[in-house]
Amino acid sequence: FELGFNGEKYELILSPEGLRSRLFPLVYFQQQAPESVLEHWNIWVGRQPSKDFMLRAGDMEIRAEDVQMWAEETEDQQVSLVLCCEKLTPLLKEDTDRVWWALSMLVDQTIGEVSAIAFVAGFDVYAQPKDKPAMLLSQLPELLQSMGLSLWRDGSDYLENSYLAYELEPVEDSEADWRLDVYTGTCRLPVIINDYLTARSDAVDEYHKDGIAV
């Protein structure tokens, strides 16, 4: 979480750390806040976009304008990104994880963390620019808006209005596992279905640890 003050109210920003599944418990927590608290506090789920955000990495200061971006639209109204920041290139050999963290933070601060979850399918980090014309990361909001997408400001609004549709080939064998005969539907958390179909339980296990799922 992050704490701040906007000149009028204190602000508590709860980060889902890039995971849609973590939005649900954070939104629930947000909605339990009493009115007496909300008189003095804004509680946000997801980092908010900040146009003038600057990230300090060691002796370097990095803004979204320092990051080159190549975007490819996916079939489900998302974008896959390739990012290259020459200021971070020397750090790639020493601490790759730190570079990924820095660029993830810049993406979140450019369009907001919830919008990043909703619209960014993923990104790769390149040490050298591609041989194609690049945009700047700071132009990502305009790119998404040109695709007809509206940025999400808060996790609660996103979850309330985002249903994902899916379609599968039904398994007609009467001895097949449960649910494999279901071929189309809508849901808000597709990772649960994916985990079930691949015999995984990562999301449910995380919920169990917090006493959410039974």
Q: What are the functions of these language-model segments?
A:
Residues 29-74:
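An exposed acidic His-Trp-rich patch
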Residues 22-24, 53, 91-93:
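Short acidic, gly/pro-rich beta-turn/loop elements at beta-sheet edges
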Residues 20, 49, 87-89:
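Short loop/turn segments at secondary-structure transitions that flank enzyme active sites
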Residues 63-180, 190, 194-210:
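Long, hydrophobic alpha/beta structural blocks
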Residues 16-21, 55-60, 157, 188-193:
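Short linear motifs at secondary-structure transitions and domain/linker junctions
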Residues 14-18, 85-87, 214:
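Short beta-strand-to-loop capping motifs
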Residues 1-42, 46:
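An N-terminal, globular interaction/scaffold subdomain
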